[in-house]
From Swiss-Prot:
Organism: Halalkalibacterium halodurans (strain ATCC BAA-125 / DSM 18197 / FERM 7344 / JCM 9153 / C-125)
Gene Ontology biological process terms, A to Z: proteolysis
E.C. no: 3.4.24.-
Protein name (record): Zinc metalloprotease RasP
Cofactor(s) this protein cannot do without: Zn(2+)
GO terms for cellular component: plasma membrane
Active site: E19
Membrane-traversing stretches: 5-25, 168-188, 315-335, 344-364, 392-412
SMART domains: PDZ
Binding site for Zn(2+): H18, H22
Broad class of where this protein is predominantly found: membrane
Gene3D superfamilies listed in its UniProt record: 2.30.42.10
Amino acid sequence: MQTLIAFLVMFGVLVSVHEWGHLYFAKRAGILCREFAIGFGPKLFSWKRNETVYTIRLIPLGGYVRMAGEDPELITIKPGYEVGLVFNEKNVVSRIIVNNKSKHPEAQVVQVERIDLERELFIEAYDDDGERKRWDVDPKAEMVQDEEATQIAPYDRQFGSKSVAQRALAIFAGPLMNFVLAFVLLAAYGFMQGIPVEDPVVGNIAENSAAETAGLQKGDYVLSIDGQTLETWVDMTMIIQQHPNEEITFEVERAGQILQIPVTPNQVEGMDGEPIGLVGIERPAPEPATLVSGLQFGATQTYTYMTMIFDVLRLLVTGQFSLDYVAGPVGIVNYTGQAAEMGIFVLLQWTAALSVNLGIVNLLPLPALDGGRLVFLGLEAVRGKPLDPSKESLVHFVGFALLMLLVLVVTWNDINRLFL
C-alpha cells in the first residue's frame, strides 16, 4: 500500500506540474483550454473552474491539456438544423441547445439558415412565424448536447490562431516545468539535508565490513582505485559496485602519506536484482547549506541528472544499452516503493530524477511527444505556412500507437525481470 500511495502521489505531482506548464502558457496566449487531465481512459473525477474542466482519469500513464482547435469540434451545426437559443440580457445568444430542447422551455426554437461560431459569431435562422432573423452570439456561449455544455471556440481562442512562438512556448512549457520541479526538489533536499560531500572521502565505516577488514579509516581521501583516478564520491562507488568479490586496490591519502590498500567488496543484490560490490563505507556528513550553496546544489544536480539521462539515450540509440534494462511503469512503481522505504529524502531525489527524465523524453523529436510537435512548428516557421492538420494528426496518432507499444514492451520486461 505504501508503494502504491507513494507512486500515485509522485505521478500526480510530476504530471500535474508538466501539464500545468502547458495550461498556464496556453492561457496566457489566449487559447481556450477545454480540459486539464491527469491520466488517460475513463473519467474518475471532474470539476470545472472558469473555462476548463479538470479531470482525474483511470490509467496513470500521463496526462494532457485539450486546447481548442487542436482537434475537430465534436459538435457541428449545419443549415436546416433546429436548435434552441437562450439569450442574455443584451439579447445575445448565450446558449445553443442542440438536442433535448423540450427540457429547456426558456429556449427559442429556430431553424438554422446560416451560422458562424468562429469569426463573425452570428446565427441567422427562421423563427416559429417563418421570419428570418439574425442574432449575435456571445464569444463565451455554450452549446448544450445531451445536457453537457461545451463552450464555443472563436478562431482567436484556438491553438492555430496564435503565432508560432506562442504555440511553441505553450508546448515547451510542459518539459520546462519538469526541469524547474527537479531544481526545486533538489534545492529543498540540499536545504534540509545539507550539501553532500562530492569528494571521494571515506566517512563512517560499518563494523565487520570489507572496508574495516582491509584497514580503511574514516577521513581517508581515495585518490584512485586500480589506477583509475577518482574525482567524485560517485566515481568511487561505481567502481566498487562493478567488482563484487574481486580484489581492488585503493590508493588513499592519510595524514600526508600515500597508501595502497587492497579491498575485496562483498557481493550484494542491487535494486535491479543484479550483483554489485559493497565495501561498507558511508559518505561524509553533509555540509550545512547556505542560500547560495543550496540553490547551486539544486542547479548542478539537475544538470547532472540531465547528462546522465542523455548518456543513457545515446547508448540506447547506438545499441550499447539494451532495452531490457529500461524501466517501464511496473519497474518505476517498484523503484518508487524502494525509495519510499528508504525515506522522504531518497524519494525526493528519485522524484527529481524522474521529473528530469520526463522532461527530456517529452522533448525527443518523436510524433505524439512535445518534441515532435515542436518539430512540426519548426517546419511551419520555415515553410511560412502550417502543414496539413489531418496529416499531422495521423503522424501523431501513429506515433502514439508506437509509444504505447513501447510501453507494453518495457512493462513485459519489468514483469519478467521482477516476478518471473
